[in-house]
Amino acid sequence: MTPLSSPLSQYWQTVVERLPEGFTETSLSAQAKSVLTFSDFALDSVIAHPEWLAELESASPQADEWRHYAGWLQEALAGVCDDASLMRELRFFRRRIMVRIAWAQTLSLVDDETILQQLSHLAETLIVGARDWLYAACCREWGTPCNPQGVPQPLLILGMGKLGGGELNFSSDIDLIFAWPEHGETRGGRRELDNAQFFTRLGQRLIKALDQPTMDGFVYRVDMRLRPFGDSGPLVLSFAALEDYYQEQGRDWERYAMVKARLMGDNDDAWSRELRAMLRPFVFRRYIDFSVIQSLRNMKGMIAREVRRRGLKDNIKLGAGGIREIEFIVQVFQLIRGGREPSLQSRSLLPTLDAIAALHLLPENDVAQLRVAYLFLRRLENLLQSINDEQTQTLPADDLNRARLAWGMKAENWPQLVGELTDHMANVRRVFNELIGDDEADTPQEEERSEPWREVWQDALQEDDSTPVLAHLADEDRRQVLTLIADFRKELDKRPIGPRGRQVLDQLMPHLLADVCSREDAVVTLSRITPLLAGIVTRTTYLELLSEFPGALKHLIMLCAASPMIASQLARYPLLLDELLDPGTLYQPTATDAYRDELRQYLLRVPEEDEEQQLEALRQFKQAQLLRIAAADIAGTLPVMKVSDHLTWLAEAMIDAVVQQAWTQMVARYGQPAHLDERQGRGFAVVGYGKLGGWELGYSSDLDLIFLHDCPMDVMTNGEREIDGRQFYLRLAQRIMHLFSTRTSSGILYEVDARLRPSGAAGMLVTSADAFADYQQHEAWTWEHQALVRARVVYGDPQLTSQFDAVRRTIMTTARDGKTLQTEVREMREKMRAHLGNKHRDRFDIKADEGGITDIEFIAQYLVLRYAHEKPKLTRWSDNVRILELLAQNGIMDDHEAQALTVAYTTLRDELHHLALQELPGHVAQTCFSKERALVQASWRKWLVAV
């Protein structure tokens, strides 16, 4: 055993002062001295439980003792009679065994592969032990879940990630997926439940038993987000539902995750074999699957973006050459060739590396270096986490913990450890880059083209200086370009740029100037790019991105030239520069039906319990998607209708995620309203009005929302902090508003306006569905019924959605007096025009002035309210274009007029989008759009001016 280093010997005196009663410095072995000096977690644990220290001193932990975990836990749970005592025993057991593992690991009594195995077996033992105890308890309460033939149904648990691979780290989340075989009902209990309800309740209790912090701590943080549909999906799925999902909707990244999936516990029964057989074809293709390479390239980009996005330094998991890259290298071969090569189907990394070597898929030397690097990094990670039982992969900045790690890794000192670590990570990065490949560097021709611009950049030319490379510019443009460069250099002098940053900037600027100054709009483009560069000069990683990826630089120049809005966004949020790396996705927005799934995948990388990171991630995802939509808009690959469709689908995905986050937080605090025990869903809906309801969002639109619930009176929540059910939904809505409006370093998510709710700002923030129906029928004004024309549920369970749709249909199909309706709609429009219309007589406000967008919207709303009692089909859609179609199809408006209004509407909307991209207000010269305005005004007179 390596003697303690000097800093640790000094720290030992602090440890001695904290030793539990009955233990002295002389009574402890050298082994105990080493472990307690190294790990505060071990020290705190034996202070609380001195008998554990005596146990360890008398008999050291053994390599194969994981075989006894299940028996030991069974003994510990023998006297457990309720959930509270179960939770206490699980926490004690986990802590006791973790101290034993920390002891063995610190002293190298057991090799590092075995440590990973012990950590994984411990987690599996605790998961299975808790599941089995709770299954029996639930069966006593509700009966045994059976299929129609009376065969009892088990809860099967898939361990994902490192747990599935038998490679769990010391302080880790556990990723789980719950499943049960067949539908049916419980039998033999005090009350019957269908199997879905039984297993959902069992799953909820199991998560609580493992995850909920108590005075004794927690067992594991449980992450269920890898299940089908993530947080918005059922907690537990039947085999049939799982099979349907993975066959019809399974994504590439879910396939990657499923490579490591392993059933927990005794898994050789018929149900387990059936589930494995069902999942295998989804994971491993029968053919050599080279189609996966592009997806893997995208994953590589995601790793790099995550490191930049989170500002990760000294991170041995996510940094360049870290653990994640080794896992990625191995997965490349598993996913491409695993279907044809059974030896590649192992869930564990090291056996798969052996198979890669045996199949000669990588050179032997590369495999050997990856193996050594992996074991080195995993030991370093586990030692780091065992100091405080803390989930971290970032190297410490303090001297004590650095000394601890150097000693634990058998290095002479911290610099030696860092040197070894750097060598290992460089080896990994080399293999990683060779396997996937990076963008090509500059060609010799590009270098030659940019060389003359080096003089312009480095010699700080004055306004009146001449240089051949600027000769093609007009005199005024040349002066402005030189002024912009000079001002930029002065700005740089105020910034604390390190030597590496200046080196990269000097490398980047000649290329940038060569590209920008070859454009006719060089002055405008350079004026937009220099503020962005000034914002990132102290963040070398972004300068390197633009310098090392010429394609990204070209896209940056093109987009900034086209849109000051995009230039402003990139300057404000430099992490968006990552999006420029892949033109395949930059100009091709996410499919309209895939935003929820993309966001779910994005959020999986963020700890579920870290609210601040969750808020940041939501905002960063939105900004990245907005950039892609705007880029496609500029490139002309998205027509106006599609731009709004994408912006609307994106907003709906964000609403879904925000509600999920708020719901999780509220349920953790209060439990859920008890009426949900008798029904599926959450009894909650979000209704979108205005542009969101009408599929017509713009780049900077806010969201008009109202919130509904169906909670009866006198219902309470079922959590430890019990509150009234309706109060729960009010707090849920308040939480949602807070999550939308909180300003982080990435800004707010959306401005949300909830004033369209019953009684406006004076009304309750969340309304029961019955009260909403009553208000609409007896109290609402005509303008509120107009607003309802453009309303639809954007989040909600089917039951509440149907209820809202029925109320909306009833209100809209109510027979109205035509003259009265015409007068009320016209007068409301005149009031709006007086308040919101353009005050500049020489300008036309595209939205608010006569002949503008709002007039078209009012015509459509008036005609629906006027004629829907005769033609109920008019209530089907909430967007203006399809309402105009319906008016023509149902004989209310002739085809020519409907088509002409549609063209006018989309033309005006298109102009608004493009003005937004130019950061210009929504008005134009009076001479613009005269044809469209005349047409709209004629239609307005026809329908809404009294004859």
UniProtKB/Swiss-Prot annotation:
SUPFAM superfamilies named among the record's database cross-references: Nucleotidyltransferase, Nucleotidyltransferase substrate binding subunit/domain
Coiled-coil segments on the chain, per record: none
Keywords: ATP-binding, Magnesium, Multifunctional enzyme, Nucleotide-binding, Nucleotidyltransferase, Transferase
EC number(s) per entry: 2.7.7.89, 2.7.7.42
Any one GO molecular function term: ATP binding
InterPro entries, per the entry: GlnE (IPR023057), GlnE_rpt_dom (IPR005190), NT_sf (IPR043519), PII_UdlTrfase/GS_AdlTrfase (IPR013546)
Taxonomy, superkingdom: Bacteria
EC primary class: transferase
Catalytic activity: [glutamine synthetase]-O(4)-(5'-adenylyl)-L-tyrosine + phosphate = [glutamine synthetase]-L-tyrosine + ADP; [glutamine synthetase]-L-tyrosine + ATP = [glutamine synthetase]-O(4)-(5'-adenylyl)-L-tyrosine + diphosphate
One Pfam match: GlnD_UR_UTase
Disulfide bonds: none
Ranges where the record places region Adenylyl removase: 1-440
Cofactor: Mg(2+)
GO BP annotations listed: regulation of glutamine family amino acid metabolic process
GO-annotated cellular components: cytosol
Region (Adenylyl transferase) location: 450-947
Protein family according to the UniProt entry: Belongs to the GlnE family.
Function recorded in the entry: Involved in the regulation of glutamine synthetase GlnA, a key enzyme in the process to assimilate ammonia. When cellular nitrogen levels are high, the C-terminal adenylyl transferase (AT) inactivates GlnA by covalent transfer of an adenylyl group from ATP to specific tyrosine residue of GlnA, thus reducing its activity. Conversely, when nitrogen levels are low, the N-terminal adenylyl removase (AR) activates GlnA by removing the adenylyl group by phosphorolysis, increasing its activity.
Protein name per its UniProtKB record: Bifunctional glutamine synthetase adenylyltransferase/adenylyl-removing enzyme
Organism, as annotated: Salmonella heidelberg (strain SL476)
